């Protein structure tokens, strides 16, 4: 199975998450490709069995680079996806990601969110247990 992972990360939390996830998927003999929103072309994504999108919530919304990337996706009709959202609030933004991708007629497989604690700018604010939560998520893909 081939996974293409598209992410955006300001302080490193989403980068840490997608790198960990890619290793877990490789343990299942999967092929993975990781791209930032700056590296990927939303009009011509590499072929994949499943696309995984990972980004933070910022200013009570989905991070703007990922939001714009999702709006610009082309030729995604019927493609499968999973979503990951990091956030410092009590409410995640998975539903905003879902709404954007449903407009592209994509099919959701799974979603997971990770609340971050204080000291966000350190890049080490993922709360204890994030790896176990991500292991469970990977098992559903």
Could you describe each region identified by the protein language model?
Residues 2-24:
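N-terminal beta1-alpha1 ligand-phosphate binding loop
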Residues 37-40:
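Conserved SAM/SAH-binding loop
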Residues 16, 24, 28, 33, ...:
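FMN-binding flavodoxin-like domain, especially the glycine-rich phosphate-binding loop
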